[in-house]
Amino acid sequence: MSFFDKIFKKFHMGVLYFAVILIGATFIYCYFTKHEKKDNNTFDALAQKNEIEKIQYNPIFANSAFCDIVVTTTDGRVIDFFNIPYDKVFEKKPNGKYKYNTYSVDPRPWNGYEHVFWVFRQCLTMLFFYCFFLFFADTIKQMGQEILASTSGKKGAKSRKVIINHKRFTFSDVAGADEEKEEMSELIDFLKNPRKYAAMGARIPKGVLLYGPPGTGKTLLAKAVAGEAGVPFFAASGSDFDEVYVGVGASRVRDLFKEAQLAAPCIVFIDEIEAVARKRGSNIGGSNGSEQTLNQLLVEMDGFNQKMGVIVIAATNQPEVLDSAILRPGRFDRHFNITLPNVKDREAILKLHASNKKLSEEISLEELAKQTPGFSGAQLEGTLNEAALLAARRNATFINKKDISEALDRILIGPTKKSKKYNDKEKRMVAYHEAGHAVIGIKIPFAQIVQKITIIPRGNAGGYNLMLPQEETFFSSKKALLAQITSFLGGRVAEELMFDDVSNGAYNDFKHATQIAKLMVTKYGMSDLGPVQYSGNTFQNDFSDPKGLEIDQQIQKIIANCYQQAKQIIQENQDLLDTIAKYLLEIETLNKRDIDEIVATGKIAWWEKEKEETNAPTQTTSQMSSNNETTNTDKTPLNDELEITTNLDNQESNESNPNNNEKASPEVLSTDSEQT
């Protein structure tokens, strides 16, 4: 909109406001005039009672059948009547005389003021409607332009333009991903010195595809490249090109690249590109709008309409669904797998996000990085942010270890369910279930290290074991996979041995154990069937029915062998199982230091000391005389009620167990507390 258009629009709005004010003033003047205003029935009543002394009339329009009259009554009142029919005023009798001949009917003389006022009022009304029409038309025009822009993609393309300054976001703001940074530095050099590569006859990669799990920093890397090079950065998502109208997506692609060409050299970043670049031919009935959009994107990247100086960076979590035409050299020349950070990268990410947070000296980011294998950069940032929120909630000045531990639990499992309270039987069942997992993790070779055990309900879990691998590896051996299956089955084995009954708490345990066993048989070649892969789905398999029976038998064999091994280990370490379950019932949460102390000494020194200090005043008050009585006071009432025994015949049958669906992973073995 030009300067004169803005002035003209403001003038129209000013006239409209002025007209509204004048019309309002006119109506107020007419309302407070000294003349009374009555309806037609009042006029008839006055005429029939012979109370009219004089009538003065004004015709509304020429040759009109109605007129406005001013009636003067016999008592001196002056009354205005509007739109009175002429026949009613000048009605005649059969003898030719007026029906109401007791009053005089004369034309009302108009003075100059009234003429001017009447003309002004009519002009003002017309001006009001004219300005209102202009205002309404301008509004409709703006709405139409917005609809047209949304369907044509022009407005969306403009809104996607973001200028990234190299001083605002660079590689120093992205922790980890050193190899990807080194590879993408070539793009930065091209954007800064394009003639250098043109002189050598080299063609810079036109597109870079970043793929990997969510939260690994794909978008941040693209922004950092633009920031390092100091070039315009056009950001869009795949859904921006998706529209109900066929052809709109292709139009938006053209508009985006047209604007990028004007700003070249520049970077066009398309996030979640799988929304627009899926494999063609999957839609029944032929081509559709999404395929037209993909075709236009292919042409813009490497076709007759290819743009020079425009580098496309795309990100996706599903590279396997992308069309092969867009992955070929000349379009996306470079494919970078942005993996989950290793321990070194996790420490760097934690240091970056902890730079603006107040951490206590007891917190070691190196140790925290070792405790978070499999965490993405987004999860690490969320952990520190959650810890900061917890510290602020309790009005603390620093973030301590307890805040970090609680934040990890919230990220992995969820918040604490304080409203859920176990009864004694449920609590014992959950304690022994989690203790069974822990015993397997402690005693079996190649198992993951137990870091934490808790029976506090959290999220959908009634309790869980946090286990970490002994070291980060890129492969899993057969012994390690069998150890994982055995660990998953430890909870069910402990229930069976201690209660002579089982609960549905091992639902997820069996699910994950079966998945691992199936992969070992059908994908990894780790069974008696040999090094062969078998694939299929619910509707079709690439193996015969007899072979499917053999696969099922091999899976059952692996599960059965691991179950027997878990039962043997727990029976051989019954005392360790009872001790862990006992302290879980008392403390509810055990960390790695507590677990190591139980394995080494059979007790937790700090807890026993705390119990002695708590029971000491009770012993003095009761004045116990014998050593046996003093020893008995060291056991709390909770221990009396929940004393653990190995006599299965004396265990109570657990008829109303919680639905402890375990949410397990290589890092977490959890017991779901939701009821079925």
From Swiss-Prot:
GO cellular component, one term: plasma membrane
Segments traversing the membrane: 13-33, 116-136
CDD domains in alphabetical order: RecA-like_FtsH
Membrane topology: Multi-pass membrane protein
Main location class: membrane
Disordered as annotated region, ranges: 610-676
InterPro entries (alphabetical): AAA+_ATPase, AAA_lid_3, ATPase_AAA_core, ATPase_AAA_CS, FtsH, P-loop_NTPase, Peptidase_M41, Peptidase_M41-like
UniProt entry keywords in alphabetical sequence: ATP-binding, Cell membrane, Hydrolase, Membrane, Metal-binding, Metalloprotease, Nucleotide-binding, Protease, Transmembrane, Transmembrane helix, Zinc
Chain intervals with Low complexity compositional bias: 650-667
Pfam families: AAA, AAA_lid_3, Peptidase_M41
Entry's localization field: Cell membrane
GO biological process: protein catabolic process; proteolysis
EC number(s) given by UniProt: 3.4.24.-
Cofactor note text: Binds 1 zinc ion per subunit.
Ranges of biased composition (kind: Polar residues): 615-636
Top-rank EC class of the record's enzyme: hydrolase
GO molecular function, one term: ATP binding
Cofactors, names only: Zn(2+)
Side Extracellular, residues: 34-115
Residue intervals on the Cytoplasmic side: 1-12, 137-676
Binding site for Zn(2+): H433, H437, D509
Function: Acts as a processive, ATP-dependent zinc metallopeptidase for both cytoplasmic and membrane proteins. Plays a role in the quality control of integral membrane proteins.
Protein family (similarity comment): In the central section; belongs to the AAA ATPase family. In the C-terminal section; belongs to the peptidase M41 family.
Description of how the protein assembles with itself and partners: Homohexamer.
Annotated protein name in UniProt: ATP-dependent zinc metalloprotease FtsH
Biological source species: Aster yellows witches'-broom phytoplasma (strain AYWB)
